[in-house]
Amino acid sequence: MHKYEHRKIEEKWQKHWLDNKLFKTKNDRFHQKYYVLDMFPYPSASGLHVGHIEGYTATDIVSRFKRMQGYNVLHPMGWDAYGLPSEQYALATGKDPKSFTYQNISNFKRQIIEMGKGVDWDKELATTDPEYFKWTQWIFKRLYEKGLAVLKDVEVNWCEGLGTVLANDEIEIINGQMVSERGHYPVIKKPMRQWVLRITEYADRLLDDLALVDWPENLKEMQRNWIGKSSGAVIEFEVASTDYKFEIFTTRPDTIYGVTYCVLSPEHPLVEKIVTQDEEKDVLRYIEQTKMKSDLDRIADKSKTGVFTGAFAKHPLTNQLIPIWIGDYVLPQYGMGAVMAVPAHDDRDYEFAMQYGLNIIEVIKGGSEGAYTGDGIHHHSGIIDGLYNEEAIEKITKHLEDRKKGYKHYTYKLRDWVFSRQRYWGEPFPVIYDEDGQIHLVPDDELPLELPYLEFIKPSGTGESPLANARDWLYVDINGKKGRRDTNTMPQLAGSSWYYIGYILKSNLGYIPLDSKEAKAVLDQFLPVDLYVGGTEHAVGHLLYARFWHKFFYDLGFVSSKEPFMKLVNQGMILGADHSKMSKSKGNSVSPDDFIQSHGADALRLFEMFMGPLEAEKPWSNEGLEGAKRFLDRVWRMFDFEITQQPVDALQTVYHQTVKKVTEDYEKLAFNTAISQMMIFVNEVYKTKVIGAAQARGFLKLLNPIAPHLTEEINETVLKHHEDLVYSEWPTYDESFLIETEVEVAIQVNGKLRGRLQVKKDMVEEDLKKLALEHENVIKHVEGLTIVKVIVIPNKIVNIVVR
């Protein structure tokens, strides 16, 4: 064979795939669909790194494998192109975000093509394309019409450094302080009027439907914890000597008889109404001090603080007077902004009671110092005396309901999605406010509402986005009145919440209207996504919001599946050679470009899949890449051997074992062990120096999803097949060849290994003894000694006992 020139071969096949649109999704309802999806990338200036290649190769292997199994495969690619990173880069460089975003997209696309990924490029989309975000804006309008998008005065995470509001999942905690995920700028709490999406309306469905999907359990648990559903009871307390009442939520209503004080958040509207004159000065001072703290500071402080209001509440069952305090560890947005304190059975309440000398009443037998928080028998508890926790909770809740003092209730940690960003580079809201402050939606036929060009996109400094400076764009006529557009833009997560649907609806004419019968038919054909591969960092951001939007689409009848992504796999991070996370600042980030030139895309793909299990973290190694290249060179040279029309008998067992193993491993995404099995097969071929034509082509099919360029080249130039392997039929195995006809038997002398025999399975015992005693190394070790006995364990061991 001619020399294996990887770049020449790879460029040839990449051109062939593009020119012939080989991976275009077919309009085929007769074959079962398979939708393989990558978490689409943000197109940064630095381009793809080898971590991207890992996930993208894994999905490409599956899409090629499924195509060969006869599925109608959808495997698209697009770009998550809006958002803060681009805007920050534009501010730093003075460049227009639109121009460099599309330059970056071109570079990313080049890299993905050069890695040999089989993508349907007719489905390509970018969240910044007007024809795409037209539908993002259209979806917002439908959310508004259904009461799920509302303007609210909310306490938001304000980042002065970025000049915008951030969602909870866009914030990190460093040294106890809230900072932005991007740039680590300080973040504070601040009240602002914002667009909010009412994801909390879907909290129970988001929880319950996790049972429908095949996701990693740790990721499901992250979503469960983020939603944070708690079961308990709301209990009403009356303020003594007044007509005022307040409610608390507790998960432990069974401890009601152990309540010795109540604590309101400093922001609770009742505080200013019930504080006594004697305590007012201290209370007001404490409220001002609380305003200087973030929520994180308030709940993280080990020493709980508070002040007495001077007021008392009546115990709802005993009418005993209970002091009412305020404490900053009680947050206004959680529960009811008020707690009943049971210091004998809650660690936080116990610390507070000890600090301020408040009463402690045990109502569950625990016998421990400090707070007892476990299960136990109730006492001093009226009608629930003698009961354990679960039964006591149910009985006391019913008792409170009967007395109109409480009711069963659920609370959630999940908060509605703050959807406004005070930045330029995002989807504009299709909203106009008239002079009376009334909201008017931009008509559907006027969408998309595009961003105006601005030479300077620095935040306005007033809390509004740079769009406040675009006067010609900002002010419009609305029914003869002066109207003003919304200056906020949508968050980056808006476009990514439905892009998996966008791929399906993408056509030569734009996008099939989401509410059309045609859209319903094609969405029913391809949804849900069969395999979604991406990182765990999106667990409580993109993945949660996409599920929310999908359920909204389900309610509108646009989709028939309750969940968007049936199987989710989190690929492990590829670390730097120093075992730390790759980053440009550390200088350990690895670009695939140089390696594709020097070793080839097939070698890079093979190496990344051979490094270890897909889900595991793995350090980068140039030496490992060399090994992958050597294996492919070995496969190339293997086709210099004689190729016979008939299968080679000596290879039949290992060939069929390899077909079975690789097929099963591809299904499990266990690519590293599939490669190991193919290496075993190649080693066996090198022993025989001959291979059957069907065995040769079958092996090429097995390797093709991982090394598509090399295998297609051999298939065409050596085997003279003109059908692309990727559309050939996946090989099958014959069970009869999987039955082992030979076994390896160990020979021991006095229990020590002295040799091995390759013999027919179930060989006659006397024949096996004879072969063992004739083994050259055994003869040496028994010479001059007396053989006492020979023990045979069939198909495993012959042990010769001598003295």
Swiss-Prot record:
The enzyme's E.C. designation: 6.1.1.4
Subcellular location: Cytoplasm
Record-listed ATP binding positions: K584
Motif ('KMSKS' region): 581-585
Record carries keyword Repeat: no
InterPro entries from the UniProt entry: Leu-tRNA-ligase, Leu_tRNA-synth_edit, M/V/L/I-tRNA-synth_anticd-bd, Methionyl/Leucyl_tRNA_Synth, Rossmann-like_a/b/a_fold, tRNAsynth_Ia_anticodon-bd, Val/Leu/Ile-tRNA-synth_edit
Listed name of the protein: Leucine--tRNA ligase
